[in-house]
């Protein structure tokens, strides 16, 4: 994380995913908090996880860090269920690929949270993403998405 924070501009949103099921979740949450704290990246870091307990631990350790709760249509582990959402008090909700839901998006937005969705759930269609007012997009094709964004912005101007 240190290398990423040092390489990218301070206002660039960085989505850090804590990939943990059970063992080590407190350690990972504390290490993530230490790194965000050391770099003072409060507004430009989102720490996300499928694991609500690790996000709760992060919230207890450093409540200033923006938390993102990832969910999926299919949950391999019951702990990934959205029933734990109130415990986490997430700032962002992050549907896993193929899990975007417009009704949930509106519910989270009305509660003051933002949604970070996968570009593939919208077939990388900027117009569709703009229509639902996505706050951010996850992509594995950064340059392609930047080009699409530029093209879309040019059409609007």
Predicted regions and their residues:
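Short loop-to-alpha-helix "cap/lid" segments that border enzyme active sites
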Residues: 2-157
């Amino acid at each position: 994380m240190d290398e990423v924070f040092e390489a990218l501009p301070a206002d660039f949103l960085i989505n850090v995913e804590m990939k943990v099921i059970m063992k080590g979740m407190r350690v990972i949450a504390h290490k993530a908090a230490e790194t965000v704290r050391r770099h003072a990246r409060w507004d430009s870091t989102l720490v996300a996880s499928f694991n609500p307990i690790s996000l709760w631990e992060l919230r207890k350790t450093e409540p200033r860090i923006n938390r993102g709760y990832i969910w999926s249509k299919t949950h391999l582990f019951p702990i990934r269920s959205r029933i734990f959402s109130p415990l986490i008090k997430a700032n962002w909700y992050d549907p896993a690929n193929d899990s975007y839901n417009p009704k949930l998006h509106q519910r989270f937005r009305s509660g003051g949270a933002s949604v970070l969705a996968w570009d593939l759930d919208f077939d990388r269609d900027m117009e569709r993403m703009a229509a639902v007012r996505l706050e951010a997009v996850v992509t594995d094709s950064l340059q392609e998405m930047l080009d699409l964004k530029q093209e879309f912005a040019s059409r609007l101007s």
